[in-house]
Every structure is written in C-alpha cells, then in structure tokens.
Amino acid sequence: MKKLLIGASLAALSLVSLAEPVSYTIEPSHTFVTYEIQHFGTSTNRGRFDKKEGSVQVDRAAKTGRVEIKFELPSVNTGVAMMDKHLQSPDFFDSAKFPTATFVGEQFVFDGDKVKSVTGNLTLHGKTNPVTLTATNYNCYENPMLKRQVCGGDFDAVIDRTQWGIDYGLAYGFPKNVHLVIQVEAVHQ
C-alpha cells in the first residue's frame, strides 16, 4: 500500500510539473524585429533592429503564455546610414528620448500545441497600444547542438504608426500602416 501511495504521489507530481509554464530565453542571433513600409507606392522600405533581448514562458497544457521582447531603437539598420540617422531623430523614433521599444504579450491563442497568435502591448515612442501578432510559422524542436528544446516562429501585424505619435511624412504620402515582423527563436532554460 505504501509503495502504491508513493507511486501515485510521484505520478501526480509529474503531472503537476507538466502543467507548469516552461521558460525560454530569446536567442538574439536567431531573433529579428523588422518592419516594412511602402515608399511612395513604388517600393518597400525595410529595416531591422539589431539589438534585442527577451524571454518567453509557455504552458501548453493550460494554453497560456507570456512573452517580452525589448529592442533598442538606436540599433535600427536599414542598410543606409543617412536613413538610420533620420529614423533615430525626433521625426520618427526619437531614440535619444525613447531608446527602447517593448512588446509584452500575455494572451496566447493555440491550435493544438502550436501558438497561432499573441496579443499584448507594444510600447514605442513613449506610448503603449495593443497589438496582436499572428503566427505565420511556429514550431518546437530538440536542438541537436544545444541539446535543449527550442521554440519559435514568425509573427506579424500591421500597425498604425500614428497611434504611437509617429506621423512624419504623412503629408508627403508616406502611409501610416507599417508591417511589423518578429521572427523569434527561444531556448528552453
């Protein structure tokens, strides 16, 4: 009887541990925060933020999670130094005054074990607004080099930059909508 109780207790404990959130740290070399915006209707301007960090907690059994991704606005990289400097100015990001942007998502939608979307708040340019990032790809796998589980995917949203007080160029015909893409891979801790 005693062995049966010990076995049942261990089984119950293992089920509890399966239902707890699993923590991941974002892998910066496999994570990219990028944006795309139309340029006078002729082409698409693209940029990325080279410095970023963050963490993810996921409880697949409870279908819950939390993600926090912080990116440094002075690290904007369009491939054109003059444009990078202008984007850091008060016309756009005002990165001297607002050096970081942060997305914190706490509403996860799952389809089975796969994350389909994450809703949270994006703080940018001193303002916070809700954003839903939709997964276009999501997977978890056992990384053969790290010997740990890695989860990640591609998430995107179209945001109205004027909600964050970034309205430079509207009078010239620049659109207010920006395609935000967050490609993330995170390593189990």
Where are each of the predicted segments found?
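N-terminal signal peptide c-region/cleavage motif recognized by signal peptidases
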Residues: 14-17
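Sec-dependent N-terminal signal peptides
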Residues: 6-11
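Low-complexity, acidic/polar, glycine-enriched regions of mature
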Residues: 19-189
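Positively charged n-region of N-terminal signal peptides that target proteins for export
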Residues: 1-4
